[in-house]
Amino acid sequence: MKKILVILAGFMISCTSQATNTESNTETGVESDQIQMKKSQNKVIKKSIEKTDGKTLVKEYNEEGELTKMTLPIEISTDQDVVIFTFDNGKLSSYKVNAKVPEMLDMTEIEMDKTKNEVRFISEWSGETYTFNEFGISKITKGGMNGKTTYSYKYDDKGLLLEIVSKSTTTYTYDVMSKDWTKRTGTDNKGNKTVTTRTVEYW
């Protein structure tokens, strides 16, 4: 009986010592791997910079992970023009055009429709309409001498782009990835591939 009591007492002391060490570790800022992994998984993206075929798309988010700003390459005067869109609670709030040749803006009519969450760029020879949702672009409609084409963007519930569909035909399907992806491959319905690289900043 004495041996059993001694063993139990030793076990109690060991448990107490472990609990004390755990408390001490917490107080000194030393965390378990499990807690660190959980924190890593819960990181909120502040800025995402995506590059595809020489084009750069920038998305910025608030600390709650909501999209607040998007810098999108749109060709108005040259292929280096960009438009900066701002968002509030997932809705389009404003836009600003940075054109390499500002004079060309006089030849383009720009209309923003907040109720439809879209912006239209209309010129003598073509027209483009960008429609947004809480994840970014939801649809692009391009019209010109050859008719109109609509590209629909499909996302999963985490906001990851799954595919771009044009005229009921999958234009690009993207490989599976996490929210922290750094390289993504898109494959069109003809087997052609495009590669997007991304750098991410966190809050």
Annotate each PLM feature.
Residues 17-203:
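Buried hydrophobic residues that stabilize the cores of well-folded domains
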